[in-house]
């Protein structure tokens, strides 16, 4: 006769069951290096919308097959396609991010006014609007746009296209009749630069939807006494759950998974500078090598690469690149002889309005976004952080940097051409395996009532 109390018999059965399941539990933990991706992205990266392929001379080309020069560029990989809903009440919902945006173009205002305006802004019955972060604002950019830099008026370049979907969002170029440049269509974000730009200017990042760039802009009065001015930019308020927060996991095998975007990154970078064609070819080479166990790496598009910028970091503030230290970053000696961090290529062409639109490609500055500025009184050019670590600009795809001794554009953006690269791939969800576990049936093994 079994005199073991029912309570003890139950727990003995559970102990035996635990031992029988131990191999399964160990198997489930045997590969901690592969982060589980059985989840929906909380930070979905909206595709750039770029559909044309280009070579390095600026010509549009048929998208090349694998193994051919210039294969692997932005137009050859489709991510979350842009999708919006017009709510009919002055608001637009992004169906990928879930964010709700103001449809209309605001008047231009200072950064302080933009912050204050959000506190009292009310539209469509909502009063929880905010100034977007730089990652929220950048989610709207589309690289189907054409940069009008150098164009003086819409009559000179009537076929230009903004870097935002104007079927849903109202848009205006700079008012040339009021002395503005056509490209003066900057929008404030709420992301303040943790260092300073120019001559110690307090700086806040913004997106220019006319020329397709992220730059840091002066957010407080600048200029000599008696001649100070405060920059004004457009504002597009947003509401909804937070967007743009990474969830990095070190897989312990040279890869980093962002469980928020469901992208897997190479922990190390290219280790040296490459021109754009070389960066694409290097990516293909790594796939041929089955680098880190995968053969589906790609050069990230502009929005994918910007997603891993850490805007709480900057060389002058944290003595580091603007990226989570979970990643390895090769330091460089910059044009002024100082230790700095690289620009990184993307697969995205920065197309412009000229007859050869595709000569330039997008990069993200993970080090200082340097430029050569001449003092207002003249004299030698001075190398400065003009746009902030985390800026998105562009470089010629090929050529000699020595041909650009004082950079490019109104802030003398340094031209390197030989930028670094970091690989990305989709972190495919792991298959969900369903196990049916049969519990042992023991007489009297049910737990006693009340226990």
What are these regions (language model features)?
Residues 14-28:
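Bacterial N-terminal signal peptides
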Residues 2-18:
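Bacterial N-terminal signal peptides that target proteins for export
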Residues 29-130, 134-298, 303-433:
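Glycine-aromatic-enriched surface loops/turns that form tight recognition elements
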Residues 449-451:
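Short, solvent-exposed mixed-charge patches
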Residues 2-5, 23, 88, 252:
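Generic secretory/membrane-interface signal
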């Amino acid at each position: 006769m079994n005199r073991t109390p029912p309570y003890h018999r139950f727990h003995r059965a559970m102990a035996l069951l635990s031992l029988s399941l131990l191999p399964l539990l160990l198997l489930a933990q045997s590969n901690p290096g592969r982060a589980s991706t059985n989840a929906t992205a909380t930070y979905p990266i909206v595709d750039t919308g770029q559909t044309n392929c280009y070579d390095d001379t600026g010509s549009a080309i048929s998208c090349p097959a694998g193994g051919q020069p210039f294969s692997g560029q932005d137009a050859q990989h489709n991510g979350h396609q842009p999708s919006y809903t017009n709510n009919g009440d002055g608001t637009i919902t992004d169906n990928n991010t879930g964010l709700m945006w103001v449809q209309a173009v605001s008047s231009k205002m200072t950064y302080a006014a933009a912050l204050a305006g959000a506190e009292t802004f009310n539209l469509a019955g909502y009063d929880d609007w905010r100034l977007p972060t730089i990652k929220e604002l950048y989610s709207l950019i589309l690289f189907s746009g054409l940069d009008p830099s150098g164009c003086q008026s819409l009559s000179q370049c009537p076929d230009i296209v903004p870097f935002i979907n104007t079927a849903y969002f109202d848009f205006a170029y700079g008012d040339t009749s009021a002395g503005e440049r056509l490209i003066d269509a900057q929008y404030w974000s709420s992301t303040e630069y943790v260092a300073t730009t120019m001559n110690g200017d307090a700086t806040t990042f913004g997106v220019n939807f006319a020329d397709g760039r992220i730059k840091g802009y002066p957010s407080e009065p600048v200029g000599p006494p008696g001649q100070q001015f405060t920059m004004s930019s457009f504002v597009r308020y947003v509401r909804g759950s937070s967007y743009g927060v990474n969830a990095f996991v070190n897989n312990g095998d040279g890869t980093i998974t962002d469980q928020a975007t469901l992208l897997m990154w190479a922990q190390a970078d290219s280790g040296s500078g490459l021109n754009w064609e070389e960066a694409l070819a290097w990516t293909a080479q790594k796939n041929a090598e089955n680098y880190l166990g995968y053969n589906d790496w790609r050069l990230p598009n502009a929005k994918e690469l910007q997603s891993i910028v850490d805007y709480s970091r900057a060389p002058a503030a944290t003595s580091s690149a603007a990226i989570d230290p979970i990643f390895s970053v090769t330091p460089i000696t910059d044009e002024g002889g100082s230790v700095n961090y690289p620009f990184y290529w993307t697969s995205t062409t920065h197309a412009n309005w000229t007859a050869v639109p595709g000569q330039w490609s997008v990069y993200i500055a993970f080090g200082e976004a340097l430029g050569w500025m001449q003092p207002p009184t003249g004299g030698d050019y001075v190398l400065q952080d003009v746009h902030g670590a985390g800026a998105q600009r562009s470089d010629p795809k090929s050529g000699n940097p020595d041909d650009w001794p004082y950079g490019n554009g109104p802030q003398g953006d340094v031209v390197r051409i030989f930028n670094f690269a970091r690989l990305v791939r989709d972190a495919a969800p792991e298959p969900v395996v369903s196990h049916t576990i049969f519990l042992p049936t023991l007489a009297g093994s049910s737990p006693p009532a009340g226990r």
